Amino acid sequence: MPDENKFPLIGEKFPEMTVETTHGSMKLPDQYKGRWFMLFSHPGDFTPVCTTEFYSFARRFEDFQKINTDLIGLSVDSTISHIEWVNWIRDNLKIEVPFPIIGDSMGRVATRLGMIQAESSTSTVRAVFIVDPNSTVRLIMYYPLEIGRNVDELLRAIKALQMSDKYRGAMPANWPYNELIGEKMLNPAPKNVKDATGRLKEFKGYAWWLTYKDVPDNEVQETKKIVKMREEK
């Protein structure tokens, strides 16, 4: 039996649970089987930073869809509060929030996922869980109350995970704009002396343990189009 008091870690299966959302009842992670999904919590409805975040997530929703990723929000507010808030966003900020938001007024889901603030039993931190099509947790992030999330970085991280899986490598800092190897990806470190000896003969690199290879250009261009920071007009 899974330990209900243990928070999920990177590399573990996302815990099974039934949640109530603004789009109805859902079973997680089965609802998103075969797709990536990003579950993110916010401290509360009708708050300044959270409202700017939801505006950004709604505005960039199609970019997440382009990389096979669904969004689902959460806070320890009721679904009624969520509905009123997204209606306010629609009416006043002129944008629809197209993704579901979990109503968790008892804090059951937030507690299970380790999202509750240390100094408060009634508010969630800005947590992010990125889950792959096999329902495995691939990335966990926590942001403090006073800082909103960077949507471009979340998109970049998801796309980088997808590229790592697809082409069996690792993605460098700031990919696809890395200062050393640009758009390329890193090879896994050799596992034995034989592999280490031949690594620089097979790939370009700075050392046998630091070599790189090309990523298909169409993948790079898709990533740049989606995650490039854009100045608002």
From Swiss-Prot:
InterPro entries attached to this UniProt entry: AhpC/TSA, Peroxiredoxin, Peroxiredoxin_AhpC-typ, Peroxiredoxin_C, Peroxiredoxin_TDXH, PRX_1cys, Thioredoxin-like_sf, Thioredoxin_domain
One function term, GO molecular function aspect: thioredoxin peroxidase activity
Enzyme kind, highest EC tier: oxidoreductase
Keywords recorded for this protein, A-Z: Antioxidant, Cytoplasm, Oxidoreductase, Peroxidase, Redox-active center
GO CC terms: cytosol
UniProt cross-references to CDD domains, sorted A to Z: PRX_1cys
Compartments it resides in: Cytoplasm
Protein residues bound to substrate: 126
Domain of life from the UniProt record: Archaea
GO biological process: cell redox homeostasis; cellular response to stress; hydrogen peroxide catabolic process; response to oxidative stress
Protein name per Swiss-Prot or TrEMBL: Peroxiredoxin 1
